[in-house]
């Protein structure tokens, strides 16, 4: 039976007694009214007092504060989510900036590493390779019937932690929590999925409590055939769903995106979401400095799918500001573990080969080795923007940052690797090394830096600024695809919300507590772009705005009426 969750009208429920209390989407706990307790056989199953959701949230927050470490806080919040989802999101709404780092990065990394140890209750779908002949049946088994947003991972590249097997399920769960908390997408319409294709992590394979398929990862044609079976089954079950690929390994992420982006409504957050939020931040930073992105020279540490995805978005924006493609690409320098990507490097991936520098253009550089290091690039290319997506901590050294500052009065430094333990440099060090001149944005949350009696806000360049608004915009507009134009629109909407760009002071990105308003603004731009590009029905701006508000779920209890099957 399908329940209609969006309306403000009473909800007709076929469940009663203990079964109703076990249904997280419907459970109100002590907030069931006396009338509801009569009709749903709940008397005796709950304490006498009838509470409001505000009273429940106050108790939950007090309990939350009793936990002293972040891992325990994460487990506690997940337990509330698996007991009473409306209360969970009401609690998040009241304490979003405090709790977002607990339910997602950086704490979710630990939760993924210890997924099998802290496992308490099933959430989402575990699609395992040994059961590949039953994928359609598994999708039918989902407790949610009208799924509109899926986040799927195969657990191979979880944050900067590598292969976590089914432990990677923590990421789709956390990501979808933010779709709801930040983008207002009803939890009744979200589904986390992990594709269990084995693991090459010996710690997981040798862990007696590991709950996944104990087998080396499948790969090649076998792997792609399995993913395709899943995608085709999703299309049969929920043909209009928005599917987000999450934390797939570099070797698979881009091929999967390229294969399916024109087949169903999908995107890859690591490639496209990261690019969109980074681009939005850079546009805002450029405007705050009185310039355009076309004026910047950008160096990347990390030339994987995420780094190259960001670079391509930057190039597209530079071209929209008047540069030719050749001119724009000449301003991008990609560095990986083998050094600067040039046309002489062998074995480059397809998406890397478009971002190489021509060796003939570097003959005037002062070099001492064949491999061109990050420091060589900073000394010779003199970048104004430095972006880290390497997953390797500490590589933005004092020497490197001081060298950058020697030729750039206001350097933009963005160590984006997650979790915090993998960050390329700590904001406090960057501020100190540049005498307070650097504009810093990070992937994980950091507190403001105090330097010479001045407080420097550190922007968290987190995808959560982008993907909830994209999801809301897709659902509100009915978009059938996620296009590059929709992603560009999201970046520009984010840039326009920057306090620094708008007022010349303050943080580069809005406060997390304002993210719901930001998501609605992004949703409007995304929906308009979808209409312009022909992947959504054209409506008036007023109609789209009403659709966004209609689709925006609020964590409030609805009244229930009893019905029968």
UniProtKB/Swiss-Prot annotation:
Residue numbers marked as site, Important for activity: 270
Cofactor needs: Mg(2+); Mn(2+)
Key words, A-Z: Metal-binding, NAD, Oxidoreductase
GO cellular component: cytosol
Transcription as UniProt keyword: no
EC numbers: 1.1.1.38
Superkingdom of the organism of origin: Bacteria
Cofactor note: Divalent metal cations. Prefers magnesium or manganese.
Binding site for NAD(+): 157, 270, 418
Catalytic activity: (S)-malate + NAD(+) = pyruvate + CO2 + NADH; oxaloacetate + H(+) = pyruvate + CO2
Stored HAMAP family: NAD_malic_enz
Protein name as catalogued: NAD-dependent malic enzyme
Encoding gene, per UniProt annotation: maeA
């Amino acid at each position: 039976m399908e329940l209609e969750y969006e309306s403000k009208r009473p909800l007709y429920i076929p469940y009663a007694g203990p079964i109703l209390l076990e249904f997280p989407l419907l459970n109100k706990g002590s907030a069931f009214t006396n009338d509801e307790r009569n009709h749903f056989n709940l008397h005796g199953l709950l304490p006498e007092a009838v509470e409001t959701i505000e009273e429940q949230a106050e108790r939950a927050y007090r309990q939350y504060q009793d936990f002293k470490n972040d891992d325990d806080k994460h487990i506690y919040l997940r337990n509330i989510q698996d007991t009473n989802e409306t209360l969970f999101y009401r609690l998040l709404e009241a304490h979003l900036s405090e709790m977002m780092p607990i339910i997602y990065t950086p704490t979710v990394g630990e939760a993924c590493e210890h997924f099998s140890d802290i496992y308490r209750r099933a959430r989402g779908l575990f699609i395992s390779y040994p059961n590949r002949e039953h994928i359609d049946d598994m999708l039918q088994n989902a407790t949610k019937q009208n799924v509109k947003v899926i986040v799927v991972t195969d657990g191979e590249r979880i944050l900067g932690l590598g292969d976590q097997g089914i432990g990677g399920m923590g990421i789709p769960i956390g990501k979808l929590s933010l779709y709801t908390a930040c983008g207002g997408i009803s939890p009744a319409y979200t589904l986390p999925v992990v594709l269990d294709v084995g693991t090459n992590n010996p710690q997981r394979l040798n862990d007696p409590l590991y709950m996944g398929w104990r087998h080396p990862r499948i790969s090649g044609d076998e792997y792609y055939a399995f993913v395709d079976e899943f995608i085709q089954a999703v299309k049969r079950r929920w043909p209009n769903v928005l599917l987000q690929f999450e934390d797939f390994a570099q070797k698979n992420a881009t091929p999967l995106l390229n294969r399916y982006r024109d087949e169903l409504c999908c995107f890859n957050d690591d490639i496209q979401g990261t690019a969109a939020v980074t681009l939005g931040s850079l546009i805002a930073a450029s405007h705050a400095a009185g310039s355009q992105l076309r004026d910047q020279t950008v160096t990347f540490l990390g030339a994987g799918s995420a780094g190259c995805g960001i670079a391509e978005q930057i190039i597209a924006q530079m071209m929209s500001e008047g540069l030719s493609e050749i001119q724009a690409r000449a301003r991008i320098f990609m560095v990986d573990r083998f050094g600067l990507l040039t046309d002489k490097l062998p074995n480059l991936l397809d998406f890397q080969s478009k971002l190489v520098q021509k060796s003939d253009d570097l003959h005037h550089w002062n070099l001492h080795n064949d491999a061109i290091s990050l420091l060589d690039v900073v000394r010779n290319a003199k970048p104004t923007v430095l972006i880290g997506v390497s997953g390797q901590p500490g590589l933005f050294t004092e020497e490197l940052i001081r060298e950058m500052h020697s030729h750039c009065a206001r350097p933009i430094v963005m160590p984006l690797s997650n979790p915090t333990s993998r960050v390329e440099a700590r904001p406090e060090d960057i501020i100190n090394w540049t005498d307070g001149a650097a504009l810093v944005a990070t992937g994980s949350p950091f507190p403001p830096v105090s330097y010479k009696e001045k407080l420097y806000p550190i922007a968290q360049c987190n995808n959560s600024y982008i993907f909830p608004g994209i999801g809301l915009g897709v659902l509100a507009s009915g978009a059938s695809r996620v296009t590059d134009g929709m992603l560009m629109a999201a970046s520009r909407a984010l840039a326009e919300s920057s306090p620094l760009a708008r007022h010349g002071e303050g943080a580069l990105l809005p406060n997390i507590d304002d993210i719901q308003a930001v998501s609605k603004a992004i949703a409007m731009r995304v929906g308009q772009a979808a209409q312009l590009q022909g992947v959504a029905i054209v409506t008036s701006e007023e109609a789209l705005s009403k659709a966004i508000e209609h689709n925006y779920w609020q964590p409030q209890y609805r009244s229930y009426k009893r019905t029968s099957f």
